[in-house]
Amino acid sequence: MGRFVVLVLLLALVVPAAAQAHPPRLPKWKPVPTGSPQQYRGLDGVNARVAWVGGSAGEVRKTVDGGRSWQDVSPPGSAGLVFRDVEAENAFKASVLSIGEGPASKIYTTFDGGRNWVTAFVNDDPRAFYDCMDFYAGGKRGLALSDPVDGRFRIAATDDWGRSWHVLPNTGMPDAVAGEFAFAASGTCLVTSGRDAWFATGGGASRTFHSRDGGLTWTATAAPIPAAEAAGVFSLAFRNPRDGVMVGGDFTAPTNGVRASGFTRDGGATWTQGGDLTGYRSGVDWVSFSPATLVAVGPTGSDITFDGGRSWKPFDTAAYDAVDCVPLTCWASGPAGAVAVLTR
């Protein structure tokens, strides 16, 4: 018995030491040139070869060869629009969202790889400002989020793969807090997983809203990231309907990542403060090759977690706004036409 106890104690000391001697290898971003000066906050990686980006001056580009070449597939007449979200199903079907008050908020959809676009939605309410959108699995139903109108966040929905959109009644939406709004920073302020949808807020309050019925009714939950005029939750990512992570902070204090993340293991019913980041982060996503690994990006660099958001490590200092992970890699996009793929 004495030898057994000694052996157990030795193992308890050796195993952690071995784990520390071989920590997970940090990845790195490999830039891929796009030939564009626009800032790409809209991003959707379909797979390791196909990705779409939306730019700050009405440009949409697509690659089908892993970023070696890019096609300009911008909708006609889109110059001057600010695209902040791209949601693509494949190399042919994609929707892009432009932001702004009134008719500046638009959604275009293509079914032929960008050769032709349908003007699927034009916001006709000057009080509305659409920030982000997402589609449920399969791509038939999608939701788009506007900042509050008449004291409540507004949701538009599509049931025909993005071809047309309609504003949903607000009777199932909780009241917004004064000054509360969403951040159109990376197209991930509204996300879906399974039959569930969530969106995140900041400004007057830092909260998440959760729907289980296609966006008709929502419940609001306080988030652990502090709220302020330029602070709150900027990005959400859910691996499944239970496990989610949030990142954000204050974009006027880009090097401050204290209390800038959180995680949930119960579908957003409760959130726990995550580990500190190395700065404000505008985008986050789950890495496909590890169930507890996520990457977060922002203007001062990137961080990675190997424990589901409990702790984070910096691994790159390049500026990126959005991140989208696909099997085998992740895509990132940002200022001055920046696009990169994650390598190990």
Language-model features: locations:
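Residue-level hotspots at or immediately adjacent to binding/recognition sites across diverse folds
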Residues: 22-344
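Bacterial N-terminal signal peptides that target proteins for export
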Residues: 1-5
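Bacterial N-terminal signal peptides
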Residues: 6-16
